[in-house]
Every structure is written in structure tokens, then in C-alpha cells.
Regions:
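Glycine-rich phosphate/pyrophosphate-binding loop shared by adenosine-nucleotide-utilizing enzymes
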Residues: 11-13, 72-77, 166
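A short beta-loop-alpha structural element at the N-terminal edge
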Residues: 12-26
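A short gly/proline-enriched turn/hairpin at secondary-structure junctions
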Residues: 36-44
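Conserved acetyl-CoA-binding loop-helix of GNAT-fold acetyltransferases
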Residues: 106-119, 123, 142-146
Length: 180
């Protein structure tokens, strides 16, 4: 998958599949993301994922992942994976994560990435997409609600950040895609 996308400010970025050669760029991206926000699971000083683990993830047929590139620099990403792909009863649920640097937030990119991700889920026969979002992340919550996601529950004390507990909403969208 590869396509150009024009942000609301007129800047052009490239959205494409993450591949094993993107390992170093992803490590740089994770570090930059960790300095900008507490709304992801990235934090300053986190040990980098191994190259072997990254390569394995890139080759997983049950995982969809794209990066948003500004030149050679990754400025955003979206991933989605089938939670239990081989399970007869539960193989219709996908989990997602989306994140981007502040410079490209509120530029129409999030909604577009969500649409691409949902299209992949439909092509995989998914019925449900789910994720979590920190309750203070108002931009993301607004995006998810606009995209048709619902808040299904609250996970209390999900993350302890700088001595403060943070709750997370559990969110989901039903795709009505299952073949009966």
C-alpha cells in the first residue's frame, strides 16, 4: 500500500506499508513520540524493540501497519492486528493503535488512517475493531467518536505516569461484516 496524502496545511506526506528496512526510522519516530506525549506506550528511555521482532511483525499476515512519511522521517503510524486469527469464535476482532507527531495532528490524517485501517479490517472479514485511549486524550477521543467508535468501558488506573494514575476508555466499532 502506498499513497500520497495532502494535509490540511497543503503539505504532502506519503502513507505506505511499514517494511523491515524502516527499522531505524521507526526507532527514531518512537523516541520523538515519547518526548511529545504520554498518550502512547512509548516513553523516554524505553529499550528499543529488537530488529528480529520488528522484522517478524512486518511479515505477519494478520497485522496491517502503515507509516506516514515526510521525506525519510516517519511522522505518524497506524497498526491493526487480528487478535485471535485462527480462533473459530473470536477470530473476528481486530485491535488498533494510531499515533502521530504534533506537527501533523488535526490535519485530516487521523480520519484518513482510520478509514484505511477499517478497509483492511473489512477485507479480512472482521466484525469488530477495538482499542483503548487515555481519558485525557480529547483529540483522539473526538476523532474516534467522529469515526463511529463507541466508548464501551473504563479501565481504571491503567497507566502510572510520573506518579499519577491515568484511566483509559475501551472503545470499539462494529463493522457488521460477518458472514452468517
Amino acid at each position: 500500500m502506498q499513497e500520497n496524502f495532502i494535509l490540511k496545511n497543503g503539505k504532502r506526506v506519503l502513507i505506505r506499508d511499514i517494511v523491515p528496512d524502516d527499522y531505524d526510522a521507526m526507532q527514531t519516530y518512537w523516541q520523538a513520540l515519547a518526548t511529545e506525549t504520554i498518550f502512547t506506550n512509548q516513553y523516554v528511555g524505553r529499550k528499543p524493540r529488537s530488529k528480529e521482532s520488528f522484522d517478524k511483525q512486518c511479515d505477519n499476515p494478520y497485522l496491517w501497519g502503515v507509516g506516514v512519511f515526510d521525506g525519510d522521517k516517519i511522522v505518524g503510524a497506524c497498526q491493526c492486528f487480528v487478535f485471535h486469527p485462527e480462533h473459530l469464535w473470536c477470530g473476528y476482532t481486530a485491535q488498533f493503535g494510531i499515533h502521530m507527531l504534533e506537527a501533523v495532528q488535526s490535519m485530516g490524517l487521523g480520519r484518513h488512517l482510520m478509514t484505511l485501517m477499517e478497509n483492511w479490517c473489512v477485507s479480512q472479514g472482521m466484525e469488530r475493531i477495538e482499542g483503548s485511549v487515555r481519558t485525557q486524550n480529547h483529540k483522539a477521543i473526538s476523532l474516534y467518536l467522529k469515526c463511529g467508535y463507541e466508548i464501551e468501558g473504563l479501565s481504571k488506573r491503567k497507566a502510572l505516569i510520573d506518579g499519577v494514575w491515568h484511566d483509559e476508555y475501551r472503545i470499539a466499532k462494529l463493522l457488521n461484516n460477518v458472514r452468517a
